[in-house]
A protein has these predicted regions:
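Carbohydrate-binding surfaces of carbohydrate-active enzymes
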Residues: 1-258
Length: 258
């Protein structure tokens, strides 16, 4: 979702925080760890799972600690003044507010856009699909074809969505189904200087169309592969080398001195 948020220049990418099962005994350290993981994924507004009322309407379990609707099933309790940690909650929430202020004020700069297949959008997609790139310091957003239709999805100075994440390259990730019109956009991106890495993709058919455009799509795909800044690979390990071959470097790096 952060790809959509970043390209379309939205104000907030919101999550309801600390709501999953098996967290009934989560400490503040656990909460901060989970929040940090989501902040790094692009979330810039986390809303703690709270209780919007002080008491029940019919007096049920009105004595302390009151009614806790999520106390069963291994779900964490709602954030409420009845909790034992409430006197210390400002330590956690003030940290959250500072982090979120920076994230909401700034503009994310992301190295790579990873475009996934239309059929893949119905599956659970892991943000660690290119772990070797993450380990090397690259950042990326997963995007779908719909994002290519955004007014902000254009290339300038060799970067996609230059007013937002300013992606330095586009990775076409295991794509079999695709629209002809969007393939033409990708070709224009490449002509405008955006490096394109084609990973394990065939572009063999048009999805959900009554028009027999499969042959046209294949023809356009062949045209894309002829371009100098387009590299095709079937190995996830070779994607990193392909990025180096088209001079795509990561935006940020760090060095640990021992």
């Amino acid at each position: 979702q952060s790809g959509t948020y970043n390209v379309n220049d939205k104000d907030y990418l919101t999550m309801e925080a600390i709501t999953g099962p098996t967290i009934e005994y989560a400490t503040m350290d656990d909460v901060i760890t989970e929040l940090g993981q989501n902040y790094s994924d692009g979330v810039n507004r986390a809303i703690l799972h709270g209780t919007p009322y002080a008491k029940t309407f019919n007096g049920y379990n009105s004595q302390w600690p009151g009614w806790l609707p999520f106390g069963g099933g291994s779900f964490g309790s709602a954030y409420t003044y009845r909790a034992a940690y409430w006197d210390d909650i400002d330590t956690e929430t003030s940290y959250m507010s500072r982090i979120q202020a920076v994230l909401q004020k700034g503009t994310a700069q992301i190295d790579l856009a990873v475009l996934i297949d239309k059929e893949s959008t119905f599956d659970f997609e892991s943000g660690n699909r290119f772990q070797n790139l993450l380990d090397s310091g690259y950042s990326y957003n997963l995007i779908s074809e719909a994002i290519l239709e955004s007014d902000n999805a254009y290339v300038e100075d060799g970067k996609l969505a230059p007013e937002g994440p300013a992606f330095k390259a586009l990775i076409l990730d295991r794509i079999n189904t695709f629209d002809v019109e969007n393939m033409e956009k990708v070709i224009e991106y490449a002509k405008s200087g955006l490096p394109v890495i084609v990973y394990d993709s065939t572009f063999s058919k048009v999805y959900g169309s009554n028009v027999e455009d499969d042959a046209v799509l294949a023809e356009k795909f062949a045209e894309l592969l002829e371009m100098d800044n387009v590299i095709q690979t079937n190995s996830v390990e070779d994607v990193k080398q392909a990025l180096a071959d088209v001079n795509v470097v990561k935006e940020y790096s760090f060095k640990i001195e021992l």
